């Protein structure tokens, strides 16, 4: 059956002399693998279209009970890696793709998640953005769509409202993010829990809650020290990892930390 859908390229795998295989997270079919015959020939019209991180519209011959589907045609929609070189953008896209590869199962459609992903890719194509802030915006929606949205309104242990107390706290005064049950707790009650938890400065918490309630087009209006979006990205990636059947990609995290601009 010939079908059309949008998708984000998760990986490129060389196949034989001129072809390649790509896992793609698609709008209508979830994660599938496609084969592009002869695409590594520079004269092929699809050469360069199926690069990791690209958003494409693709036409495929999709067959039931097959793990590999042949691409008939494709159109490049967005290419965040082809924009002006930016190391922070590169590392953010790498984090995004690695997270998607972990949490998406084969042929499990997530149309709502794809809509958030499409908005994120579009924002990552723009210059002079806080790319880690964009990723944090996506990750809080990812965990919500996957069914383990953290509690951000009241302490997950005591039930006490978080907002009045958090707004009165100094920016570097800590709350705690508990992985199980997922959500925020005050320092006192969190001491009773033995499951994994992370200290979270009050300002980082307020940012997390703000991100959970805002459209992506509000992000350029906020100015906040870069360590807070970065902290949220690391926290939410780890939170994802403990709620799925995969182990955290420790090696990949080390690579990211080594290539960040502030480590060069």
From Swiss-Prot:
NCBIfam families per UniProt: reco
Entry-linked InterPro entries: ARFGAP/RecO (IPR037278), DNA_rep/recomb_RecO_N (IPR022572), NA-bd_OB-fold (IPR012340), RecO (IPR003717), RecO_C (IPR042242)
Name of the protein in question: DNA repair protein RecO
PANTHER family named among the record's database cross-references: DNA REPAIR PROTEIN RECO
Family: Belongs to the RecO family.
Known role: Involved in DNA repair and RecF pathway recombination.
GO biological process: DNA recombination; double-strand break repair
Domain of life: Bacteria
Gene Ontology CC: one annotated term: bacterial nucleoid
Keywords from the named record: DNA damage, DNA recombination, DNA repair
């Amino acid at each position: 059956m010939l079908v059309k859908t949008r998708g984000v390229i998760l990986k490129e795998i060389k196949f034989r002399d001129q072809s390649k295989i790509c896992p793609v997270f698609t709008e209508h079919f979830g994660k599938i693998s496609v084969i592009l015959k002869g695409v590594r020939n520079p004269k092929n019209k699809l050469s360069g279209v199926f690069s990791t991180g690209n958003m494409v519209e693709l036409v495929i011959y999709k067959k039931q009970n097959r793990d590999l589907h042949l691409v008939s045609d494709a159109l490049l929609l967005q290419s965040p890696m082809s924009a002006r070189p930016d190391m922070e953008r590169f590392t953010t896209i790498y984090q995004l793709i690695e997270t998607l590869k972990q949490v998406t199962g084969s042929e499990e459609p997530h149309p709502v998640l794809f809509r958030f992903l499409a908005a994120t890719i579009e924002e990552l194509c723009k210059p002079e953005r806080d790319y880690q802030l964009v990723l944090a915006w996506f990750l809080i929606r990812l965990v919500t769509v996957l069914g383990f949205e953290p509690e951000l309104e009241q302490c997950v242990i005591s039930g006490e409202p978080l907002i009045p107390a958090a707004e009165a706290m100094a920016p570097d005064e800590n709350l705690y993010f508990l992985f199980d049950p997922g959500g925020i707790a005050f320092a006192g009650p969190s001491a009773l829990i033995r499951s994994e938890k992370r200290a979270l400065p009050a300002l980082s918490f307020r940012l997390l809650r703000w991100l959970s309630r805002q459209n992506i087009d509000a992000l350029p209006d906020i100015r906040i020290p870069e360590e807070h979006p970065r902290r949220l990205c690391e926290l939410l990636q780890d939170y994802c990892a403990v709620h799925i059947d995969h182990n955290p990609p420790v090696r990949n995290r080390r690579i990211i930390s080594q290539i960040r601009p502030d480590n060069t």
